[in-house]
Regions:
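A compositional/biophysical signature of low hydrophobicity enriched in polar/charged and small residues
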Residues: 1-176
């Protein structure tokens, strides 16, 4: 991995070895560095150095299990757009929303609303309870909710990682 300087500053760039390491870890999160180096046909130290850099730069942020909310009883997914009172800003609202376990993500957005939340619930009636908890959070002025009927493309980053990878420099060698 290396950096490219743009008008916005230095942007980390990954190469095809970084992408291969990330892809392997995505497919087999419990694989060890030694086994990864064998499968990728590179030195163990190279894989470890690349992983250390990917972690240090925030490209790889963890190895936790991916949990499908539906498999633990939360079969309803909805997106809630919030308009907030501008007096206190986003931070106090975000802190309150973070206390609601059914909120999986909160994004500040442009457009008609100020924040977008991805939430889950057990049933539609339970979704009403979650929405009630959201709209009673101090600073929330209005909420608009849409329920997801299906998720034909789940959250994924591996295609993006592959698209972002640049070919390694040199004849089969890359900087560790």
């Amino acid at each position: 991995m290396y950096s490219v300087t743009t008008a916005g500053g230095s942007v980390p760039v990954i190469d095809d070895l970084d992408a291969a390491i990330i892809g392997l870890l995505h497919a087999e999160p419990r694989i060890g560095v030694l086994e990864a180096s064998r499968r990728l046909n590179v030195a163990r130290g190279t894989v470890q150095a690349r992983l250390d850099r990917l972690h240090a730069r925030g490209v790889v942020t963890g190895y936790g299990p991916d949990v499908d909310p539906e498999t633990i009883g939360f079969g309803v997914t909805a997106f809630v757009t919030l308009e907030i009172r501008q007096v206190g800003g986003h931070d106090p609202v975000t802190e309150r929303l973070a206390l609601i376990p059914e909120i999986l993500e909160v994004h500040t957005i442009t457009g008609a609303g100020d924040m977008l939340c991805r939430v889950v619930a057990r049933t539609n009636a339970d979704l009403q309870r979650v929405i009630d908890a959201i709209v009673t959070a101090e600073g929330v002025a209005r909420a608009s909710t849409v329920i997801a009927l299906a998720t034909p493309v789940r959250y994924r980053v591996l295609p993006l990682v592959r698209a972002a990878a640049r070919p390694r420099s040199g004849a089969g060698h890359s900087p560790a």
